[in-house]
A protein has these predicted regions:
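Residues within the helices of the helix-turn-helix
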Residues: 7, 18, 48
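The alpha-helix within a helix-turn-helix
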Residues: 10, 21, 51
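The DNA-contacting recognition helix of HTH DNA-binding domains
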Residues: 17, 28-29, 58
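Short, charged recognition helix plus adjacent turn
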Residues: 33, 59-90
Length: 90
């Protein structure tokens, strides 16, 4: 997980850890722990909320939570190559 990019997106949106903690229904301490951990500690449902709260594109979501592994895997599957530009907003 790219913790620096996650924090940068939060700051860019003028949100505090407290704001995201409230949106996720967790304590501020838990949010701090999740945001500072190199290992992805977010549940799938929490990631969906963060996509909305941080207004993340697919590329940003992939970069933050999966270190671009989703994109790498999709590029290997030829049938997905035609939809990749749509996912990235290109």
């Amino acid at each position: 997980m790219n913790v620096r990019l996650l924090k940068a997106k939060r700051v860019e949106r003028n949100l505090r850890q407290k704001d995201l903690a409230k949106a996720l229904g967790i304590t501020e301490k838990a949010m701090c722990h999740k945001e500072c951990s190199e290992e992805n500690k977010f549940k799938a449902a929490e990631m969906l909320i963060l996509i909305d709260e941080l207004n993340l594109s697919f590329a940003e979501f992939d970069a933050i939570f999966f270190n671009r592994e989703l994109t790498k895997r999709l590029r290997k599957i030829k049938k997905y190559n035609s939809i990749l530009p749509a996912l990235f907003g290109n």
